[in-house]
């Protein structure tokens, strides 16, 4: 299914990848074993990089390419995110400089969230918590204001960026709303 994303919005691709129980087990185990704490009000949100030699990288990359959203965009900085039970919600933010992500650019950069487990979620300003089931993929434009959700249970999910040549994303930086 190929589609375009509206400005500043998001699109959910239902069951982008059909995960096997073994794939889920390996991804969750890898995330829990290798993750380090990241930007969050507590130390319960962690991440670990997924490079192109990891078994899941090509599976996910191929599925994402088939949607058409990667056209004119470059997949970068793929990570597994691991939220421990009790993880607090992040502050609302942009992943890209909002002064650079405008309607005047040819193609906007995007963020991507892929659910390895049911009840994966992301807070989107004006929408609240947007839930994903296992295998669902949420693609959101760089000017979509969002926040990592609070979790009262452990959750592992994949996150990556779809960068564009016109806008340089600062690694590990956010712009608060």
Language model: regions and residue ranges:
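Non-heme Fe(II)/2-oxoglutarate
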Residues: 1-72, 78, 89
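Intrinsically disordered, low-complexity regions enriched in small/polar residues
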Residues: 12-15, 32, 41, 45, ...
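Catalytic core of non-heme Fe(II) oxygenases with the double-stranded beta-helix
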Residues: 76, 83-150, 155-158, 165-177
């Amino acid at each position: 299914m190929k589609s375009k994303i509206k400005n500043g919005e998001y699109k959910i691709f239902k069951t982008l990848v059909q995960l096997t129980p073994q794939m889920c087990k390996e991804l969750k185990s890898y995330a829990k074993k290798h993750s380090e704490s990241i930007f969050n009000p507590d130390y319960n949100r962690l991440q670990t990089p997924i490079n192109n030699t990891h078994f899941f990288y090509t599976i996910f990359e191929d599925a994402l390419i088939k949607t058409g959203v990667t056209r004119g965009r470059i997949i970068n900085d793929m990570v597994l995110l691991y939220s421990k039970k009790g993880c607090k919600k992040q502050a609302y933010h942009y992943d890209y400089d909002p002064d650079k992500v405008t309607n005047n650019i040819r193609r906007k950069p995007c963020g991507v969230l892929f659910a390895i487990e049911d009840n994966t979620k992301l807070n989107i300003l004006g929408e609240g918590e947007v839930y994903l089931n296992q295998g669902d993929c949420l693609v959101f434009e760089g000017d979509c204001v969002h926040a990592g959700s609070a979790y009262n249970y452990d959750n592992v999910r994949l996150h990556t960026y779809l960068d564009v040549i016109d806008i340089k994303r600062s690694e590990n930086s956010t712009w608060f709303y």
